[in-house]
């Protein structure tokens, strides 16, 4: 097993298969990387662009090069950490476990009353897997465990463990089956400790948010609060967004829970949890704190609730948090976009040096091999864009003057709204120079995620056309572009200092630094799919 020094995340796909990844090994070794950190590599849907829609966890992707190509990559001189997806598989005819009715009810979490399956978040095409069944675990992990035993894989990254019925039991099973190194994609609320699981640590979002907040000047908070569009406090926005998701997107999950128990005020209970999930039984102090004031607190902690209700409640809250906060509230509350990141709290405007060091000390004590990141395939923007936008807090008065000038460019009553425009303007400053086509794609996704004037289910084509026209008008406005370029240059200089500082911390703080593909150089990327564009390795 190779010594763990630094990992490098590769998003495999049509433009980057095992052979292409192998060609990068000499470059990455010279960079100081010890391990390739590969996106899911098992057989996925034929048109998959990411690998998380696995159809056969017992076979390595033929499109990426098959097992022979994987073995050649693993023997090229760097260790391998493999991202696996135990929570769900593709609900697709290509998946024999889904296509066979008998296997479907055995492998997947299917409601016997309605025939509906537990979904990954709101994606009907991804069905929840019953990893709590030992036979299902054995069948779906046979290949992954063999790759570890054969020395081809040094460790596993576990996607969305919070979707599993019992994450702790699952992780103990992995450890007992010989997997020594495991990292979990566990999203922690600021200040929430990782449970005492048999893992190396998380994939690093808590470090990302602390490092970003450390470089946000708290002196700019009042000015940025006054200059941004009027808005309720972030906790109120987040709660409302979660409640909307519970009543809409996750109505089928709520109905299933109601059949299991007459729990009081279930919608509010699902919307009020301040963390992604609890882990009952056994109930720890962290669970009791998270459930304080929750309508179902006594029911969950008493041990009297049906076991299936407790399990499904805990499997549902992570989806509510992810879709309500990450994918809705983060696009509605736009005071400083640098703080709107997975696992972050936009109402926390900067942190002290003492608090940052406290987090480092805790990591060194409990999980010294946890990953340290500044960007992933799931972040809302690259570390460099985040650093630039965060630098606005240190020049808040100057930013406010620009905002007051640009406010006249956003006519009332026409798309975009001032709040939407404020998001777009921050993005321009953070990612400039930015091609118009990329901005249009980002604006469309951001507005659909916000779900205020358009959305994914029923897009308002006319409204979105108006936003595109407004963006094009900005680029055609020479006076605006000249103004933007003056500010963007100043922000870029401050952002570079911040980004380099955060990178230095990533390379020296307790933990294992991870570099997202292409991020060893300046990378001005936005949310996916923008951050999954091909890297120019030349």
Where are these regions (language model features)?
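Conserved phosphate/anionic-ligand binding catalytic regions in large, soluble enzymes, centered on
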Residues: 270-278, 325, 369-385, 424-434, ...
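Structured alpha-helical segments in the cores of large, soluble enzyme domains
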Residues: 136-149
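N- or domain-start disorder-to-order transition segments that initiate the globular core
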Residues: 129-133
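Polyanionic (Asp/Glu-rich) segments that form extended negatively charged tracts
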Residues: 167, 180, 211-236, 241-262, ...
